[in-house]
Amino acid sequence: MWPLWLLASLLALSQALPFEQKAFWDFTLDDGLPMLNDEEASGADSTSGIPDLDALPPTFSAMCPFGCHCHLRVVQCSDLGLKAVPKEISPDTTLLDLQNNDISELRKDDFKGLQHLYALVLVNNKISRSTRRPSAPDGLKLNYLRISEAKLTGIPKDLPETLNELHLDHNKIQAIELEDLLRYSKLYRLGLGHNQIRMIENGSLSFLPTLRELHLDNNKLSRVPAGLPDLKLLQVVYLHTNNITKVGVNDFCPVGFGVKRAYYNGISLFNN
């Protein structure tokens, strides 16, 4: 039988609502790391949050893909019906927006030479796989990647290991296997909401020692994922709208006294 204070605490935490993204450039400084705010709300305008490029002074780089808008170090190639990542992208580009196109895969040389690329947005494409080699010498050092509203059935295993934020919400991912997250030990935020995830293999989350936010809402999980107590920096967990029928006393916090970990800011368990 659980103590009443513990049940009350979990009930209060379970009412936490998802974060609301105000703008794509809403950086939050967290121990010196710029983090982009999340957008997990369904039905949101997929173009909201992208900078108003008309308000930015243009640069006169000769390298700008046909049909794209290039301002400063931002390249916006959205809504062009592109079937592949365009060529002739300036090597000093830091943000590349490719949302609302028909790109079906990421190939090994798509981003070759883009050593300063910080953020890549691939929302609402037809991406079902990535054929990048994990050790591809393309110099890509992404911090932020969003492949939402696509056709992924699993977590790609060949994305840059430099990622701090990976958002794969609104796909068709069904499971998280042990080796899926092996490369991504630097992740601070992982978004996997609105998928079809039924199973998370034990030990999968152990490869994410710096994780602070985990979004697993709107999936088909029947229990709280194993390994959450071991993530000492984890502060936010979204598990609402799943099929979770019970919560164990040790599902979120480590066993024993004197075990140091960050305090939770939010745990959402409603609609289970």
From Swiss-Prot:
SUPFAM superfamilies: L domain-like. Residues 17-37 form a propeptide. Residues 1-16 form the signal peptide. Keywords: Disulfide bond, Extracellular matrix, Glycoprotein, Leucine-rich repeat, Proteoglycan, Repeat, Secreted, Signal. InterPro entries: Leu-rich_rpt, Leu-rich_rpt_typical-subtyp, LRR_dom_sf, LRRNT, SLRP. Disulfide bonds join 64-70, 68-77. GO terms for cellular component: extracellular space. Its main location: secreted. Glycans are attached at residues 42, 48. It comes from Sus scrofa (Pig). It comes from the Eukaryota. Belongs to the small leucine-rich proteoglycan (SLRP) family. SLRP class I subfamily. This is Biglycan. LRR repeats lie at residues 92-113, 116-137, 138-161, 162-183, 186-209, 210-232, 233-254, 255-272. Found in several connective tissues, especially in articular cartilages. Residues 55-91 form the LRRNT domain. Homodimer. Forms a ternary complex with MFAP2 and ELN.
